[in-house]
């Protein structure tokens, strides 16, 4: 009787979906202020990338505990074990040397912000000889240094300083993440900044782990990401955030 009972119990668990009660928990660090992708509000992580990652994790049988920190501390959270992974990080050749990435969660990129009512520059070449500011924490500084050496690049601390230097006239333009820059310009500097409509650099954002570690986690999340793209969940999330 006992073997029969155990066999039945095993078969029940085999057909049960991986709900949060049975799911493996992973800790994911993110920039505490990176709207609309990820930010910490009232002790809760939210954003477009957060919703997408949560949906993919559910498909993969994973539960995520978020660890919001200042961007400059993200690498440290992986090194000291506070987090298993970090997101949303832009995939570029430099980061591929130290991180392994999932499939992209969302596509973003760099854009140029100028003082209103000036029109948006038509790319970096239009800013030859002019001062462009960008935060040190992102991938845009390296790209500008390599591809537009004729630009007077000033690397600063963060988005707040970038906007301050732009609006004070210290800089002619600010090179910022397209969505993040637009969100902050709209909420903090309404009417003072021309909102760009195009990217000068396209970048995919993904979840990252330290190189050579947690390949199983990457594989599981890749399957989850593929699943939510196939069943329309990804598009529904993107549409919801686009309407905000």
Model segments located where?
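Short helices/loops that flank or line small-molecule/ion binding pockets
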Residues: 67, 72-84, 100, 125-126, ...
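Flexible hinge/capping segments at coil-to-helix
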Residues: 114-132
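Ligand-binding clefts/hinges and TM-proximal coupling segments of bilobed small-molecule sensing domains
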Residues: 63, 139-156, 192-195, 225-244
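A ligand-binding cleft/hinge motif common to bilobed small-molecule-binding domains
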Residues: 89-98, 143-146, 172-201
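Periplasmic-binding protein-like
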Residues: 31-32, 106-114, 185-226, 243-244
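Extracytoplasmic small-molecule ligand-binding "clamshell" domains
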Residues: 23-93, 97, 155, 220, ...
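Bacterial N-terminal signal peptides
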Residues: 7-20
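Short amphipathic alpha-helical coupling segments at ligand-binding clamshell hinges
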Residues: 48, 52, 123-126, 177, ...
């Amino acid at each position: 009787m006992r073997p029969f009972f155990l066999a039945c119990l095993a078969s029940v668990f085999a057909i049960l979906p991986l709900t949060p009660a049975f799911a493996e928990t992973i800790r994911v660090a993110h920039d505490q202020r990176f709207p609309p992708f990820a930010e910490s509000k009232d002790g809760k992580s939210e954003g477009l990338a957060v919703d997408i990652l949560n949906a993919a994790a559910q498909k993969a049988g994973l539960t995520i505990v978020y660890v919001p920190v200042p961007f400059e501390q993200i690498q440290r959270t992986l090194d000291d074990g506070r987090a298993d992974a970090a997101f949303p990080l832009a995939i570029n050749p430099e980061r591929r040397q130290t991180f392994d990435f999932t499939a992209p969660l969302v596509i973003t990129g760099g854009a140029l912000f100028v003082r209103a009512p000036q029109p948006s520059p038509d790319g970096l070449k239009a800013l030859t000889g002019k001062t462009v500011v960008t935060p040190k924490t992102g991938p845009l500084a390296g790209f500008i240094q390599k591809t537009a050496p004729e630009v007077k690049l000033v690397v600063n601390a963060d988005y707040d300083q970038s906007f301050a230097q732009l609006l004070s006239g210290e800089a002619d333009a600010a090179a910022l993440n397209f969505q993040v820059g637009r969100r902050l310009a709209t909420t903090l500097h309404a009417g003072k900044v021309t909102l760009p409509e195009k990217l000068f650099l396209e970048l995919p954002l993904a979840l990252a782990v330290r190189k050579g570690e947690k390949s199983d986690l990457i594989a599981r999340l890749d399957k989850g990401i593929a699943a939510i793209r196939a069943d329309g969940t990804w598009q529904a999330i993107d549409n919801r955030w686009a309407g905000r």
